[in-house]
Amino acid sequence: MAPSIQSLSMIHDSQECIKPIPAFSCCYLLRSCVRHASLYIGSTPDPARRLAQHNGDRYGAAKRTLRENLRPWEMVAIVSGFTSRVAALQFEWAWQNTKVSRHADLDGNATQELGVRICPRTAKEVKRVAKPRTSLTNILANLHLLLRSPYFSKWPIEVRFFSADVHRVWQVWLQRVDGLLNDGIRVVTDFAPDGISEVEGKELLAGAGRVGTLDVGYNSIKEYVEKSQFLLEDGERINCGVCKQRLILQHDIIAVCSHSSCHCAAHLSCLSSHFLKDKDSDSELVPREGTCPTCYSKLEWLTMMKEISLRLRGQAEVNRLFGRRQRAGTPKGQGLKSVRGRGHSEDENESDALQVSTGLDTVNLPPCSDGPWTIDCAIGVLGGIAHRPGGVSSGNDSDATVTPEIETHPQRCRRNQNTRTQRLGLQKSAMINLSDWYDAEVIE
């Protein structure tokens, strides 16, 4: 049966306050490269950027990581798969305060034995008194405890290790503990390549290492989002792949198969019931994965929910994903044929709005019919003129170069260099209005 949803107006009306499922959000474990006993737990949507902040390369480090005698820090493990930043913060707090968390079962042998520590280098037990809060073994034991809890065990969590010795401690602890992790929780390793020298290792650490290769955007589902838009905006009649009833695009919440060759679409409630029925589990209310009713391929529920949230309340994120940005100051008429940008802004919100270049722009005019001539000028944001020999701009890599190709007319070209220079001196904007160039004058 189709869902009894009357309208999606409430979802669309709440787009300003409800954001889509974030592309990436994780909790991380830091370890000081100088003193391995110094550890730090935090959460972030961008691990590489956050690691640079902790190491002092960018502004915004935590108070506990400001000490220069403990820098640099390395990110040894992350826990990802959270559907919101609130969920990541919730797991972060539980990981930092496992003893007082209601999700941790402290009965029996759930916690680490006092006075027992596992050496990361030799993977052997060291029976000496250690601080439980700063012990790597204790932190990994608390992580294992939370992942086995009834609350977090049903989340689509992935644990990724970047350090081999930390992963060795994790494996030793798995052999000691009685409980097992849920099959839905993935544990992967992402170590640095073998054969790296000490100098190369320091450079790799300064550049965030393997952490910098993580996909923290929606690029992994870009083709999926494009396919769903094309399928649902086609206007043809689409029937639910489960209940076979017609889908009402304006009223139903529709889930689309993530495989590129399949055109299956279904009601969200129908597909959820189909997934739970195949798993034959009465304890779960939200599925984690399932098979498509048409192509019988494996589908991840979190991936489908990301696409639905982007489609219903993430139009701004979709526009940034496909580069649909209107260039400020671009004339509607013909003339401006090529716009070339160089470099990228380091601002975190650079994709939220089109930034005005803070450098110099180089403008090149094509030759007039009377003879070859070129005016090279650099127009700054404040309207100043800086002539460069040969038309070479002295701006840095973040400068944007705008090169308009303008068709000139002989009857409108006047040979007066002084007048032309004065006209350029009155320019107050970095953007070029084509109507100002119709009266261009030839400089001989």
From Swiss-Prot:
<dbReference type="GO" id="GO:0017108">
    <property type="term" value="F:5'-flap endonuclease activity"/>
</dbReference>
<feature type="region of interest" description="Disordered">
    <location>
        <begin position="324"/>
        <end position="354"/>
    </location>
</feature>
<keyword id="KW-0234">DNA repair</keyword>
<comment type="subunit">
    <text>Forms a heterodimer with SLX4.</text>
</comment>
<protein>
    <recommendedName>
        <fullName>Structure-specific endonuclease subunit SLX1</fullName>
        <ecNumber>3.1.-.-</ecNumber>
    </recommendedName>
</protein>
<keyword id="KW-0378">Hydrolase</keyword>
<feature type="zinc finger region" description="SLX1-type">
    <location>
        <begin position="240"/>
        <end position="295"/>
    </location>
</feature>
<keyword id="KW-0479">Metal-binding</keyword>
<keyword id="KW-0539">Nucleus</keyword>
<dbReference type="InterPro" id="IPR048749">
    <property type="entry name" value="SLX1_C"/>
</dbReference>
<dbReference type="InterPro" id="IPR013083">
    <property type="entry name" value="Znf_RING/FYVE/PHD"/>
</dbReference>
<dbReference type="InterPro" id="IPR027520">
    <property type="entry name" value="Slx1"/>
</dbReference>
<dbReference type="GO" id="GO:0033557">
    <property type="term" value="C:Slx1-Slx4 complex"/>
</dbReference>
<keyword id="KW-0540">Nuclease</keyword>
<keyword id="KW-0233">DNA recombination</keyword>
<comment type="similarity">
    <text>Belongs to the SLX1 family.</text>
</comment>
<keyword id="KW-0863">Zinc-finger</keyword>
<dbReference type="InterPro" id="IPR050381">
    <property type="entry name" value="SLX1_endonuclease"/>
</dbReference>
<comment type="function">
    <text>Catalytic subunit of the SLX1-SLX4 structure-specific endonuclease that resolves DNA secondary structures generated during DNA repair and recombination. Has endonuclease activity towards branched DNA substrates, introducing single-strand cuts in duplex DNA close to junctions with ss-DNA.</text>
</comment>
<keyword id="KW-0227">DNA damage</keyword>
<dbReference type="InterPro" id="IPR000305">
    <property type="entry name" value="GIY-YIG_endonuc"/>
</dbReference>
<dbReference type="Pfam" id="PF21202">
    <property type="entry name" value="SLX1_C"/>
</dbReference>
<keyword id="KW-0862">Zinc</keyword>
<feature type="domain" description="GIY-YIG">
    <location>
        <begin position="23"/>
        <end position="105"/>
    </location>
</feature>
<dbReference type="GO" id="GO:0008270">
    <property type="term" value="F:zinc ion binding"/>
</dbReference>
<dbReference type="GO" id="GO:0008821">
    <property type="term" value="F:crossover junction DNA endonuclease activity"/>
</dbReference>
<dbReference type="GO" id="GO:0000724">
    <property type="term" value="P:double-strand break repair via homologous recombination"/>
</dbReference>
<dbReference type="InterPro" id="IPR035901">
    <property type="entry name" value="GIY-YIG_endonuc_sf"/>
</dbReference>
<keyword id="KW-0255">Endonuclease</keyword>
<dbReference type="Pfam" id="PF01541">
    <property type="entry name" value="GIY-YIG"/>
</dbReference>
